[in-house]
Amino acid sequence: MNHFIEIRSYTLKPGTRNEFHRLFLEQAYPMLQRWNVDVVAYGPSLHDEDSYYLMRRFDSLAHRAHSEDSFYGSDEWRQGPRESIIACIEDYTEFVIELDEVTVQGLRK
């Protein structure tokens, strides 16, 4: 069975990567787990000081849309870490690819 992997590449405001990582680990990641979002991998990029990545697995494009609408529309997100996290982000790009289970497992951290 293939899965849909969303890869987000964040360009963070200069000097905010450590704070972004802390906020992700302490607040966003636990929330994603509570919302049953399968986080495959995440972390600071190795190529510069202002980049970060997030990879999430979904069963279908419809599952991704529903999951994101539910999570980002929730009071927990909007009244929780949203503003602090967004304050660190200058820009981001996302794309979705389809991968088999073996490849997805190989990407997990």
Where in this protein do the model-derived segments appear?
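Glycine-rich beta-strand-turn "strand-cap" elements at beta-sheet edges
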Residues: N2, D38-Y53, R78-K109
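Short, structured motif recognition centered on aromatic/hydrophobic residues
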Residues: F4-R8, F20, L32, S51-R56
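An amphipathic, aromatic/His-enriched active-site/gating alpha helix that lines ligand/cofactor pockets
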Residues: R22-V40, R57-F95
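Short alpha-helical
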Residues: G15, Q27, H47-E49, A62
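Non-catalytic surface loops within mature trypsin-like serine protease
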Residues: L12-P14, S60, E98-E101
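Short, surface-exposed ligand-recognition loops at beta-strand->loop->(often short) alpha-helix junctions
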Residues: T11-H21
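Short, histidine-centered active-site or binding-site loop motifs used for metal coordination
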Residues: S9-L12, L46
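Short acidic, gly/pro-rich beta-turn/loop elements at beta-sheet edges
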Residues: N18-F20, R64-H66, V104-G106
